Amino acid sequence: MPQVGVIVGSASDHPVMEDTMKTLEGLGIEAELVTASAHRNPERVREWVNGAAERGVEVIIAAAGGAAALPGVVASYTTMPVIGVPLASSELGGVDALHSIVQMPPGVPVACVAVGAWGARNAALL
């Protein structure tokens, strides 16, 4: 059973998040990776998050670029820890995603790591 759930909004995010998956594997931590967009597949995101605890997931790592809604949407559906990984997917180099993730409103907590591959690796280490 996976202890960590990793969710990304697009298949194009997979290469960066391979650092997360490899780091978790190296630590002997089982993880699952799913692709579901907060903008294009919000219902799929909700269903995945709501079933996470039943699958054994204890923490969720959510990666997103641009408006980076995914980590906050995930956190709105669960009380388990959510770590947001901002990705550099726009002309702003990930600063937009970073600001979106660190500015969650009260009651929707998301921990935030560095932009890109360094953050992806650190999310696994947390």
Go through the PLM ranges and name each one.
Residues 1, 52-54, 75-77, 101-106, ...:
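Solvent-exposed alpha-helices and their adjacent loops that cap or buttress functional pockets
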Residues 90-126:
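Short, glycine-/small-residue-rich phosphate/pyrophosphate-handling segment
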